[in-house]
Amino acid sequence: MLIKIGNLIYTLVLIPHVLTYLLKRHLFRYEVERWGEVLRLSVSPRNDVRLFLTLVRDIREFRTLFYYRLGPRYFLLRWLAPGMPTCFLHGSERQNVGRGLVIHHGHSMRLGAKHVGEDVEIWHNVTVGKKQSGGELPTIGNRVKICTGAVVLGDIHIGDDATIGACAVVLKDVPANSVVAGNPARIIRHNGQPCNVAL
């Protein structure tokens, strides 16, 4: 009984989030549907508000992305239901992160890039940023997957449909349709064919 009352109170706290979503639905609908597909939740055009409520209630990484997209003016929402405290999305321009970004287990995740393409997936303990103080940031293409513990640093370009393997250290450009792994990272698959090529 107490758990049901607690869930009801928490859902009521999220009413401002739902109202914000309804006002800015055109900005977030794709994001909500994408998270629903990736997490294998029920997705249909008629249940996007219910799906949004599920995501914003249960998934702190989604809340972090939602707040990032809204910007600092919506700090009250952040106060009512905090996002993931160790998941950092950097960039003063909200447009530098393409739509459809999905963050899996956002613990100790730091994303700072010139541009992040659409439908990118990132796992926990990932660092994307500058190689050195004052250095340049990476550019991430579309449909890129950056797996657990990977490090992507410097003025480099990660091509479309690339996968950065777990714990890979990437300091050079990664071609499109490639899988890289290791430290230093090497291409282990390109265009679906196994290989072993230095970056």
Where are the predicted features?
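Terminal amphipathic alpha-helical/low-complexity segments used for targeting or macromolecular assembly
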Residues: 1-86, 195-199
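Short, flexible segments with low predicted structural confidence
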Residues: 48-54, 68-69, 73-75, 91-93, ...
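Aromatic-residue detector
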Residues: 70, 85-88, 106, 112, ...
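Right-handed parallel beta-helix
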Residues: 78-100
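Left-handed beta-helix
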Residues: 92-94, 98-100, 104-107, 112-113, ...
